[in-house]
Amino acid sequence: MNYYKESYYTNRELSWLDFNYRVLDEARDKDNPLLERVRFLGITQSNLDEFFTVRVASLRKLMSVNYTKPDPAGLTAADQVSAISDKAHEMVKRQYNTLNRSLLPLLEQHAIHLLSMADLNEEQHAFVKNYFDDELYPALTPMADDSSRPFPFIGNNTLNIALRIYKNGDKKDRKFATVQVPDVFPRVVVLPGAPNQFILIEEIIKAFVGSLFINYTVKETSCYRVMRDLDLDVAEEDTSDLLKEVQKQLKMRERGKVMRLEVEKSMSKHQRTRLAKALGINESALYVINGPLNLTFLSKLVKAVQGHEDLNYPKYHAYYPAKYRERSIFDLIKDHDILMQYPYDDFKPVVDFIHEAAEDEDVLAIKMTLYRVSADSPIIKYLGQAAQNGKQVTVLVEVKARFDEENNVHWAKKLEEMGCHVIYGLIGLKTHCKLALVVRRENEGIKRYMHMGTGNYNDVTAHFYTDMGLFTADTDMGIDASNIFNMLSGYSEPPYFHKLHISPDGIRDFINEKLDDEIAIAKAGQPAVVKMKMNSLSDPQIISKLYEASHAGVKIQLIIRGICCLRTGIKGISDNIEVHSIIGRLLEHSRIYYFSNDGEPQIYLSSADMMTRNLNRRVELLFPLLQPEISHRAMTIFETMWADTVKTRILQPDNTYARVDGRGLEVLDSQAEFIREAEQAVKADHGDTTPTSNAHQFIPMMSPKNEPDASDLDREDD
């Protein structure tokens, strides 16, 4: 049977836009706290920005070389760009309808005001005038566009003001100028007087920008913003120094082609046409915005609000068992494997694992992969400390991790300075696996301790990405881990692995084998079940194998937060497949793979999604949960999420997503349930209601910075 028909597949890019619509739904959800709804709206903007600078940019490159091969859904690059444009324009309209018709009026009901210049009282007007004169004016640079001064370069994601001016006494002599809004100043300006009154910096500049043009009159002012191609193109095979090549490409990336132009609705048609021509874009790439450009400022607005704790998610305490503070982490791991579920379990034991290894005299070596780390990473600190304490420390820092290249280049150099052996990544592959190995001398001989995870070693994103990690001292897994690091650092090619599976190729082969096993079980008339949780499913071969399993009678449950190119409800093809997507307070990021295995279930965690890039072009890790209590907990986590009736959307046969019809069902928000369980564990551990672990105000779907906000995004772990 042919499982590759175009009608069986959804285009990857359009599926991603559907995901961002689900995030936008959270901004429109009246059951969410108001300030969290505002945050969600900012997140949709940052998500959309990266989508254009990477995915749309990639499609336009294909168009530029006349690449016409269709994707599995039958769409060429040109077809996709056209469909994206239609869907994205509609999304932008919905974003600003949500802002203007819902969120801003609701904020005003709570005495939180985003004001215009016309709204300011006398005191506030004097304040912004002084602010402009004393702070902003010296930093502003007017740029003319005429025969002797060509149109200036407009940087990616910078906010700019287009002006139409004429010389005093000569209204016919109209000229164009542009002024960049300096990003060294806060965009959200707190006004004096009543609390929670704000104005955007561009409104102040537009009001007083005329002082930059002496003997000229300003006829029109309007903001605009461009998004450029930021897709890094590193010629790895042709470079002898990967680090230098990445740094070179980072500089070149700043001048990528324009993918999208946003202009204020108030901008005249004449100005729009002039800008579009100067920037080299067509009408489909022009977005007319009914409100402030670049909604990522909303996270800054939320942070600036004083009081109103009731308009945020309530804080809670991650679980950090007392025994972790009382005993050596190595003794705990030696006793039994430890499964962690972040952020409900505190991430601190992972940091402690490296910290204790750095100080333990019996530790001989530490080996670790780093993909995205925070801007002030304690793990980096302790790895350097370990090297300075005479231990052999080897760290693979993936310098090609998208939009973290500069941060990772910085840390790679820092680790080298501290005495660590640093690997910058492998040619042609990104190392995306999350693996830490500690080699320790004990009375019984050399012992290996490991941490393997589904998410990054990032102490910041661990607060709002849901991930899982395993501590183990399993001997076979330890041998496998050593072989993986030997492969990453040298020329080793292990003939096989005992219990771990890696990509490229290995994870694909393993998943196919397990699905074939379930197909055989179903054909033998026995119950066969597959359960998977991942961020995205787009690989055509894996999807076709899932269709084959469904056709054979295997019951398949998929929890997929983001991209899903598989279609449900196709008669005889996907009748036995159900797909859920959970979008909530925290970003679902863990990967779980369950196979019923003829009554002896097998459960695995992984760093890999079922995407072609993860299976073919990444070094990924898939590892088993072997101890019964550990595997049972993992499946309880999956089942709780599957039973979610609050934040789940179910993929429909028409390719839309619908919320669960909760009539007659228990109301269950899986993330809220995990939070409740964590709080109960904290209280039970301390014997009172005063937790000792740090409380967290979690922010969903943002990237690894020490000050996460909606200018960052869910990067789909490229």
UniProtKB/Swiss-Prot annotation:
Keyword terms of this UniProt record? ATP-binding, Kinase, Magnesium, Metal-binding, Nucleotide-binding, Phosphoprotein, Transferase
Q: Where is this region: Disordered?
A: 683-718
EC numbers: 2.7.4.1
Cross-referenced CDD domains? PLDc_PaPPK1_C1_like, PLDc_PaPPK1_C2_like
Active site: residue positions:
432
Comp. bias (Acidic residues): 709-718
Cofactor (UniProt)? Mg(2+)
Q: Which Pfam families match?
A: PP_kinase, PP_kinase_C, PP_kinase_C_1, PP_kinase_N
- The entry's Mg(2+)-binding residues are 372, 402
A single GO BP term for this record reads: polyphosphate biosynthetic process
Catalytic activity annotation: [phosphate](n) + ATP = [phosphate](n+1) + ADP
The record's InterPro entries line, in alphabetical order, gives: PP_kinase, PP_kinase_C_1, PP_kinase_middle, PP_kinase_middle_dom_sf, PPK_C_dom2, PPK_N_dom, PPK_N_dom_sf
GO MF term (any one)? polyphosphate kinase activity
Role this protein plays: Catalyzes the reversible transfer of the terminal phosphate of ATP to form a long-chain polyphosphate (polyP).
The family note in this entry says:
Belongs to the polyphosphate kinase 1 (PPK1) family.
What is this protein's record name?
Answer: Polyphosphate kinase
Q: Which organism is it from?
A: Lactiplantibacillus plantarum (strain ATCC BAA-793 / NCIMB 8826 / WCFS1)
UniProt lists the gene as: ppk
